[in-house]
């Protein structure tokens, strides 16, 4: 039976439960344990796939094609375990499963209720996702006191009652606000948060106290006294300059030792080696170079919509000890002739998106980068914009467009995918009338790269696998015409039916590459990703006046 660490939050949301949990997971992993993570989200959507990026932020995609919460991105950036749809569960999915079972008659005519049917389904999902691991960390979304979270809290209370303290731990992250007028930290919100948690039958084993500054020992003792938590288990989580330094901070305070002692794992663990995290922090704090990258998107007012893109760019810089400064630009603002916002930029990245708003701005951005020889990296919609730009302005296909934006276009160079193979080899089909949710080409897909191309050079191998999330694709009817006009198709699906990567010849542009996949989902601070490393290096070379630079690894 896998020992479980349940991570809850109190007082306010967005305190960083996911980062704290992932940091602890990375320490336990460094000590030799096989670790996994899971997110329980209280919203009634089945998954975040159809939620607005302005409300929810990024939709993170796993290898098996699950559309999940962005916290799974945090998890995979901190731990080596690759997650799946089992690791992201919502209230919507729980109710969907229970109702499906009720319709099949699985409950034998019983009245279906929150307790025991909903809570049992939650526990079943937890068991399924965590089986076979040494330790599992499970984050409960939302804040204690929210009505939506109650079924999840009741389910984990039941787990603790049945398994005992040696197999289930409660970790509660709470706010200790600093009141500037009084010049002191206030512990009362934490006391009330724990009181709320205890009222539903959960006594925390560990408190993570988020604050602007380190919580002094006197306040930790006070919190311990009023919350019935050991002083040793009251952990200070102050604001830090580099988030990737959180594993080092939690290790310093001995959080991992609390877990090992409670779960009696001493005979399974070794000393923690966090040298990779120390190297990451050092590279962030002591860069040797810096570049300015423009990110031209549709949801830039809510930057969590591009969380993995921003992190992957920074990772690409870390591998070269280069600070990456991001300039966020709204695509709609670039739909005219004024491209002054892109002056003095070392590289341009156009990320994914849906719908016609801002698409023309992305096309204009591609045209600017192509003509001005600025390194360009297009992802998903950014690739489609680059193809439309090339079709219109180089191949002379007037009014070329994507059918997503103009179904009457005389040259639909981007069209709806009607049939494709999933990661497991199964054929999926869709049409214009299909549901939006869960009907895209999703998950890890292999692609073959063309020898002698930029893509092949950057990746360093012939076959690569990337995660996808898209409904529209390069229209094969225009392959030959655009290749004859000079566009290089450097990556194709293994069955040769889908275009995966396009680029410009190196003799016409220093670095212009666009891919249909989402490589940002496979980038980590310790390893980076070849495309982002190559793009940042190209930006550095542009800044250096075209001089070829040797990579300085972190």
Swiss-Prot record:
PROSITE patterns: GATASE_TYPE_1
Domain Glutamine amidotransferase type-1: 292-545
Record keywords, A-Z: ATP-binding, Glutamine amidotransferase, Ligase, Magnesium, Metal-binding, Nucleotide-binding, Pyrimidine biosynthesis
Protein name, as recorded: CTP synthase
Keyword DNA-binding: no
Pathway in which the depicted protein is active: Pyrimidine metabolism; CTP biosynthesis via de novo pathway; CTP from UDP: step 2/2
Binding of ATP, residues: 14-19, 71
List of residues binding UTP: 13, 186-191, 222
Description of how activity is regulated: Allosterically activated by GTP, when glutamine is the substrate; GTP has no effect on the reaction when ammonia is the substrate. The allosteric effector GTP functions by stabilizing the protein conformation that binds the tetrahedral intermediate(s) formed during glutamine hydrolysis. Inhibited by the product CTP, via allosteric rather than competitive inhibition.
Active site, renumbered: 380, 518, 520
Species lineage: Bacteria, Pseudomonadati, Pseudomonadota, Gammaproteobacteria, Lysobacterales
Organism: Xanthomonas axonopodis pv. citri (strain 306)
UniProt-annotated binding residues for Mg(2+): 71, 139
Name of the top EC class for this enzyme: ligase
Gene Ontology terms describing biological process: 'de novo' CTP biosynthetic process; pyrimidine nucleobase biosynthetic process
């Amino acid at each position: 039976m896998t020992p479980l660490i349940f991570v809850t939050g109190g007082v306010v949301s967005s305190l960083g439960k996911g980062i704290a949990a992932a940091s602890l997971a990375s320490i336990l992993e460094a000590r030799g344990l096989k670790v996994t993570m899971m997110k329980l989200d209280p919203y009634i959507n089945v998954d975040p796939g159809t939620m607005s990026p302005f409300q929810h932020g990024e939709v993170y995609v796993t290898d098996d094609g699950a559309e999940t919460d962005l916290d799974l991105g945090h998890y995979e950036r901190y731990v080596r375990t690759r997650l799946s749809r089992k690791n992201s569960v919502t209230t919507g999915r729980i109710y969907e499963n229970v109702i499906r079972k009720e319709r099949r008659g699985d409950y034998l005519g019983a009245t279906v209720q929150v307790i025991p049917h909903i809570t049992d389904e939650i526990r079943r999902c937890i068991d399924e996702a965590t089986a076979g691991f040494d330790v599992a960390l499970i984050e409960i979304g939302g804040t204690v006191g929210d009505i939506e979270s109650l079924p999840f809290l009741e389910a984990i209370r039941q787990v603790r009652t049945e398994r005992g303290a040696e197999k289930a731990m409660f970790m509660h992250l709470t706010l200790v606000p600093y009141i500037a007028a009084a010049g002191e930290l206030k512990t009362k919100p934490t006391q009330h948060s724990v009181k709320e948690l205890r009222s539903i039958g959960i006594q925390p084993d560990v408190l993570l106290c988020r604050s602007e500054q380190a919580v002094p020992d006197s306040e930790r003792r006070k919190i311990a006294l009023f919350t019935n938590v050991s002083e040793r288990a009251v952990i200070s989580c102050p604001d830090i300059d580099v988030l990737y330094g959180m594993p080092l901070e939690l290790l310093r305070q001995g959080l991992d030792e609390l877990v090992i002692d409670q779960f009696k794992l001493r005979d399974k663990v070794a000393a923690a080696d966090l040298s990779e995290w120390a190297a990451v922090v050092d590279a962030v704090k002591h860069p040797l170079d810096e570049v300015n990258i423009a990110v031209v998107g549709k949801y830039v007012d809510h930057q969590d919509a591009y969380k993995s893109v921003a992190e992957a760019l920074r990772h690409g810089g870390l591998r070269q000890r280069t600070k990456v400064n991001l300039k966020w630009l709204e695509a709609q603002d670039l739909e005219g002739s004024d491209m002054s916002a892109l002056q003095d930029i070392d590289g341009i990245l156009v990320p994914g998106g849906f719908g016609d708003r801002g698409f023309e701005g992305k096309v204009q951005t591609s045209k600017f980068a192509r003509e001005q020889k600025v390194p360009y990296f297009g992802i998903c919609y950014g690739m489609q914009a680059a193809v439309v730009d090339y079709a219109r302005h180089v191949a002379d296909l007037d009014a070329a467009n994507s059918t997503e934006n103009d179904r009457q276009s005389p040259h639909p160079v981007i069209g709806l995918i009607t049939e494709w193979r999933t990661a497991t080899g199964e054929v999926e089909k869709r049409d214009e009338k299909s549901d939006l949710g869960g009907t895209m080409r999703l998950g890890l897909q292999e692609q073959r790269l063309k020898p002698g191309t930029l893509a092949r050079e950057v990746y360093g191998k012939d076959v690569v696998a990337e995660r996808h999330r898209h409904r529209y694709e390069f229209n094969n009817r225009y392959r030959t015409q655009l290749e004859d006009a000079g566009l290089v198709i450097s990556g194709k699906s293994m069955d040769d039916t889908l275009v995966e990567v396009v680029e410009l010849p190196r003799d016409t542009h220093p670095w212009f590459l666009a891919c249909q996949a989402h490589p940002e989902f496979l980038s980590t601070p310790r390893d980076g990703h070849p495309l982002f490393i190559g793009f940042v290096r190209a930006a550095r070379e542009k800044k250096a006046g075209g001089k070829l630079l040797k990579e300085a690894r972190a």
